[in-house]
């Protein structure tokens, strides 16, 4: 008989209350910051917009969460909900594409990697979209491209501005040329926005790479980024292996890109609503933001 069993028989109550208290603690109550490794109380993190209160690191968040933080509460219309991805090429790598889609849809409760909502910002109507990075790395396939174009079309029809929060690894390789075509398709749609004189603000969050960074994400009238976001085309390890040189400190971080003129401004998540409203107010002729808003 082990010592632990012997103690449990003599003092059974010593162990049971501890187990009971442990079982009463809900899962996910604490979260570890990936930057400072501090442990943060989940409700506190929620109140702080998923920004670490210890080091100000902007944690990755879902598309729905991001749009909820950005748009006014109230009536919202989702665009492109009837669109679902199709495995036209019967693509298979280590896993069938259709199986990857099923797994991603189950994990995220989304049909694909872009959510588009028509809503309001401080009472002014606009269209906003956000990439869901947890859906196959936020990769852009046919559905993502079509939803984005439909968002643009709504803006053109109703004379509204467009805001896009990008978080993507790039074009979806499982759709091959169908995916690459979305780069041209979304870029052409944004040219129509430009010709119509309607503003498009691109917000680059962590991370934005590949075909998304090489198309719609960098085509904003104003390109905004969250602090410390990774932004580029190829990843830093790939670049280092190609050029056989050590990259500068902070290479591809939003602060580095701002310093070298690749983006226009860095905005904290806490200030995103007010900052983007003021930008759009100047472009759209909206009324100035009231002090109590």
UniProtKB/Swiss-Prot annotation:
It comes from Alcanivorax borkumensis (strain ATCC 700651 / DSM 11573 / NCIMB 13689 / SK2). Its EC number is 2.1.3.15. Acetyl-CoA carboxylase is a heterohexamer composed of biotin carboxyl carrier protein (AccB), biotin carboxylase (AccC) and two subunits each of ACCase subunit alpha (AccA) and ACCase subunit beta (AccD). Keywords: ATP-binding, Cytoplasm, Fatty acid biosynthesis, Fatty acid metabolism, Lipid biosynthesis, Lipid metabolism, Metal-binding, Nucleotide-binding, Transferase, Zinc, Zinc-finger. Zn(2+) binds at residues 33, 36, 52, 55. The keyword Cell division does not apply. NCBIfam families: accD. The lineage of its organism: Bacteria, Pseudomonadati, Pseudomonadota, Gammaproteobacteria, Oceanospirillales. This is Acetyl-coenzyme A carboxylase carboxyl transferase subunit beta. Belongs to the AccD/PCCB family. Component of the acetyl coenzyme A carboxylase (ACC) complex. Biotin carboxylase (BC) catalyzes the carboxylation of biotin on its carrier protein (BCCP) and then the CO(2) group is transferred by the transcarboxylase to acetyl-CoA to form malonyl-CoA. It catalyses: N(6)-carboxybiotinyl-L-lysyl-[protein] + acetyl-CoA = N(6)-biotinyl-L-lysyl-[protein] + malonyl-CoA. InterPro entries: AcCoA_carboxyl_beta, Acetyl_CoA_COase_Trfase_b_su, ClpP/crotonase-like_dom_sf, COA_CT_N, Znf-ACC. Its cofactor is Zn(2+). It is an enzyme of class 2 (transferase). Gene3D superfamilies: 2-enoyl-CoA Hydratase, Chain A, domain 1. SUPFAM superfamilies: ClpP/crotonase. Transmembrane segments: none annotated. GO terms for biological process: fatty acid biosynthetic process; malonyl-CoA biosynthetic process. A zinc finger (C4-type) spans 33-55. Pathway: Lipid metabolism; malonyl-CoA biosynthesis; malonyl-CoA from acetyl-CoA: step 1/1. It holds the Pfam family Zn_ribbon_ACC. Its main location: cytoplasm. Residues 29-293 form the CoA carboxyltransferase N-terminal domain. One of its GO terms (cellular component) is acetate CoA-transferase complex. It is found in: Cytoplasm. GO terms for molecular function: acetyl-CoA carboxylase activity; ATP binding; carboxyl- or carbamoyltransferase activity; zinc ion binding.
């Amino acid at each position: 008989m082990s010592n632990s069993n012997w103690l449990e028989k003599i003092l059974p109550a010593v162990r049971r209350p501890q187990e009971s208290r442990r079982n009463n603690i809900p899962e996910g109550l604490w979260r570890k910051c990936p930057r400072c490794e501090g442990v943060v109380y989940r409700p506190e993190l929620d109140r702080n917009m998923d920004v670490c209160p210890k080091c100000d690191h902007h944690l990755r968040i879902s598309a729905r969460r991001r749009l909820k933080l950005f748009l006014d509460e109230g009536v919202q219309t989702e665009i492109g909900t009837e669109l679902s991805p199709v495995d036209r090429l019967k693509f298979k790598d280590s896993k069938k594409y259709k199986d990857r889609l099923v797994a991603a849809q189950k994990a995220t409760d989304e049909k694909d990697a872009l959510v588009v909502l028509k809503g309001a910002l401080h009472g002014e109507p606009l269209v906003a979209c956000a990439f869901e990075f947890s859906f196959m790395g936020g990769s852009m396939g046919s559905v993502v491209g079509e939803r984005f174009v439909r968002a643009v079309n709504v803006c053109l029809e109703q004379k509204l501005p467009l805001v896009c929060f990008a978080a993507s690894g790039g074009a979806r390789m499982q759709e091959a040329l169908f995916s690459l075509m979305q780069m041209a398709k979304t870029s052409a749609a944004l040219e129509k926005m430009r010709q119509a004189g309607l503003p498009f603000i691109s917000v680059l969050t962590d991370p934005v790479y590949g075909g998304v960074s090489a198309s719609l994400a960098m085509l904003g009238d104003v390109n905004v980024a969250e602090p410390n976001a990774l932004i580029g085309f190829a990843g830093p390890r790939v670049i280092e292996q190609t050029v056989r040189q050590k990259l500068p400190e902070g290479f591809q971080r939003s602060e580095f890109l701002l310093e070298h003129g690749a983006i226009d401004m860095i905005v904290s998540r806490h200030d995103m609503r007010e900052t983007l409203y003021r930008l759009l107010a100047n472009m759209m002729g909206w009324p100035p933001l009231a002090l109590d808003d």
